[in-house]
């Protein structure tokens, strides 16, 4: 079983890689057979190639990502609240999701689900 410290460190690396636009760093956190459902209710992306494509599209704009609460990590699962800020066509937007990671025995993310909806998307200042 993964320790809370390991899972928290993975979340911190994920946030840092998003901020740096580090596609390889993000993809390296996931198992080869992982799934990403972002947002929840959308078609899950499965496998390294699909996950790479998803994050490559996500990183087309510079992102400012910040954890807003402590990471909750227990029993091979972690959840974390954060904000993602970006500017598109002169308009700043802030999204406030909660992501849920599930880990395999090797410490890799096997499932990522992003929970957010319209009420969690705001015009930035």
Swiss-Prot record:
InterPro entries: Ketosteroid_isomerase, NTF2-like_dom_sf, SnoaL-like, Steroid_delta5-4_isomerase. One of its GO terms (molecular function) is steroid Delta-isomerase activity. The gene is ksi. It comes from Comamonas testosteroni (Pseudomonas testosteroni). It catalyses: a 3-oxo-Delta(5)-steroid = a 3-oxo-Delta(4)-steroid. Changing residue 39 to A: Perturbs active site geometry and lowers activity. Pfam families: SnoaL_2. Changing residue 99 to A: Lowers activity 3000-fold. Keywords: Isomerase, Lipid metabolism, Steroid metabolism. Substrate binds at residue 99. The active site is at residues 14, 38. Changing residue 116 to W: Slightly lower activity at neutral pH. Increased catalytic activity at pH 3.8. Homodimer. It is an enzyme of class 5 (isomerase). Induction: By steroids. This is Steroid Delta-isomerase.
């Amino acid at each position: 079983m993964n320790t809370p410290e390991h899972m928290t460190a993975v979340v911190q690396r994920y946030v840092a890689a998003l901020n740096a636009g580090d596609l390889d760093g993000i993809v390296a956190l996931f198992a080869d057979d992982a799934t990403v459902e972002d947002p929840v209710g959308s078609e899950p992306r499965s496998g390294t190639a699909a996950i790479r494509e998803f994050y490559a599209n996500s990183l087309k704009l510079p992102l400012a990502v910040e954890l807003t609460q402590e990471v909750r990590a227990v029993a091979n699962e972690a959840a974390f609240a954060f904000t993602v800020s970006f500017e598109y066509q002169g308009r700043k937007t802030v999204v406030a999701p909660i992501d849920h990671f599930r880990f395999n025995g090797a410490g890799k993310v096997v499932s990522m689900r992003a929970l957010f909806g319209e009420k969690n998307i705001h015009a930035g200042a």
